């Protein structure tokens, strides 16, 4: 189990993320007001753990994550896991691959973050998330009946 340490929303493309104490989360869209949230997208909310940020000497929000977590082992998470964050539920849809913009923060950071940039999620249940809220895995990948490609993952 972990906790929400920081919440960020991007209001204008290519501008710094804005930190929030709490944020409304919209089902199948993402954070209210965040330009990166889109209906149907598998990239509605991004998460990174504080431990990774600390390892690379990065401040929360600088790599454009929506949620900075603390105390949850990202290595134990998998595509299809359902996370309860505050009173919302999100499905992990895949790893967040570091883009070339990471090298704008610090040359070589894109390669350094490969495999460690966190997770992408889609919002399954709307609600509100606040700093300090608990994060818990509420369903493993194989238990998540709403995942459309579940059969392919189980059989393949």
What are these regions (language model features)?
Residues 1-101, 128, 138-156:
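Electropositive, beta-rich accessory/interaction domains or terminal extensions
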Residues 117, 124-138:
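Compact mixed alphabeta submodule
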Residues 102-123:
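A conserved acidic, glycine/proline-rich C-terminal tail/linker
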